[in-house]
Amino acid sequence: MSENKVNLLDFDRNALRAFFADELGEKAFRADQIMKWIYHFGCDDFSQMTNVNKALREKLARIAEIRAPEISTEQRSSDGTIKWAMRVGDQEVETVYIPEADRATLCVSSQVGCALECKFCSTGQQGFNRNLTVSEIIGQVWRAAQVVGFPKDTGKRVITNVVMMGMGEPLLNLSNLVPALSLMMEDFGFGLSKRRVTVSTSGVVPALDKLGDMIDVALAISLHAPNDKLRSEIMPINDKYNIQEFLGSVQRYLSKSNANHGRVTVEYVLLDHVNDDMEHARELAELLKDTPSKINLIPFNPFPSNPYGKPSNSRVDRFSKVLMEYGYTVIVRKTRGDDIDAACGQLVGDVIDRTKRTMKKRMQEQEISVKML
C-alpha cells in the first residue's frame, strides 16, 4: 500500500467526519458508514462496502487505506492466552489476548519500548524507541479481532475489555492514546463501555491531570511500593513525581470520572523480600486510606538477567490478608501466559539498540517535563 495514502485508522469519529466533509466533500454520515464497516465488520476493502456508493468507494481506494499492524508471530499458551508480535514500521510490539469464562481482555501496547526503566519490568529494561500512532494502537485491537472474531462473525463481542498495560507508558503518548481510546468506546467503533477500557500509568502526574479533562476511562495505577524510598529504587519516575503527588493526581482524576465507581485499581507487583513484608502491607494500607482503592497483587514474573524473585504463596497470602483486615478489596492476579512470556512485566518486542538509549531517554524526559505541562 502507498505511503501517501491516508490511513483511516488514524481518525477518531470527529476527525473522520471532518475529513469526509473537508477533504472529500461528502456528508458526515458517510464517515459513520465507513466506521461501521471497519470496526463492526472488520472490513478493510472499500470495494466490499456495499451500502456506500461506487464513486465514493473508488475515491477512497485512490486516496485512503485501512491499515492495521501485521502479525509477525503468534504464540498460544496452554491456558488459552494468545500473544502476538505485531509489526509497526520496522519494529514490533506485543499484544496479548486473555480469555476467561466471563470476559476476554486484550492487553495493548502504547509505545515501542519504554523510557521509565522500572527495575522489575522486562520492557523497561529494553529502552525506548518511539510512540505508537493512533492507527498502531487501535490497529492492535482491530487485528486481534480479525483473529478471534468481530461481532458480525460471532454474533457477540469477543473482546470485552481493553487494558493499556502492554509495552510503554500510555500517558507519555497522550495525543495518540486519547483518539484510540475514543475509537474503542465509540458506538461506531468497537463500542466498549468506558468501565471496560482501562489505562494504567506509573505516575506521569501532569499527563494524568490532562487525561481527566480529555476522556473518561477506568484508571489503574502502577504503585508497587508503599513509600518513596523503596519506590524510587524500583521505579525511577518516583524521583520526578513522588507518591503523594501521584495520589493527589489520582484523586483529582476520580473526582472527574464516572468510569471508576469512585475508586482506583492499585497494581502492586510483589517482589520476594523486597516489597512484600507484612510491614509493607500495613504501610500500603495506611498510604491509601484517603484514596478509595481496590488492590491487585501481582506475584512477580521472573525474566532473565533480573535480580528479583517470585514470592512464595504463603508470603502472598499474608500480604493479602493484612490488606483485607484494613477493609480493602484485594485480588491476587492469576498469572496468565507465562509459558509464552505474556505475563505482566514480560513483554519485550523488538526495540532499540542500547547505544541509542541515552538520546531517546533524554527526549522522553523532555516530554515529561515540558509537553505535558
UniProtKB/Swiss-Prot annotation:
Binds 1 [4Fe-4S] cluster. The cluster is coordinated with 3 cysteines and an exchangeable S-adenosyl-L-methionine. GO terms for biological process: rRNA base methylation; tRNA methylation. It catalyses: adenosine(2503) in 23S rRNA + 2 reduced [2Fe-2S]-[ferredoxin] + 2 S-adenosyl-L-methionine = 2-methyladenosine(2503) in 23S rRNA + 5'-deoxyadenosine + L-methionine + 2 oxidized [2Fe-2S]-[ferredoxin] + S-adenosyl-L-homocysteine; adenosine(37) in tRNA + 2 reduced [2Fe-2S]-[ferredoxin] + 2 S-adenosyl-L-methionine = 2-methyladenosine(37) in tRNA + 5'-deoxyadenosine + L-methionine + 2 oxidized [2Fe-2S]-[ferredoxin] + S-adenosyl-L-homocysteine. It is an enzyme of class 2 (transferase). Disulfide bonds join 107-344. SUPFAM superfamilies: Radical SAM enzymes. Its main location: cytoplasm. S-adenosyl-L-methionine binds at residues 168-169, 200, 222-224, 301. GO terms for cellular component: cytoplasm. [4Fe-4S] cluster binds at residues 114, 118, 121. It comes from the Bacteria. Its EC number is 2.1.1.192. The active site is at 94 (proton acceptor), 344 (s-methylcysteine intermediate). The keyword Iron-sulfur applies. Residues 100-339 form the Radical SAM core domain. It is found in: Cytoplasm. The keyword Metal-binding applies. Reaction proceeds by a ping-pong mechanism involving intermediate methylation of a conserved cysteine residue. PANTHER family: 23S RRNA METHYLTRANSFERASE, RADICAL SAM CORE DOMAIN-CONTAINING PROTEIN. Specifically methylates position 2 of adenine 2503 in 23S rRNA and position 2 of adenine 37 in tRNAs. m2A2503 modification seems to play a crucial role in the proofreading step occurring at the peptidyl transferase center and thus would serve to optimize ribosomal fidelity. This is Dual-specificity RNA methyltransferase RlmN. It comes from Tolumonas auensis (strain DSM 9187 / NBRC 110442 / TA 4).
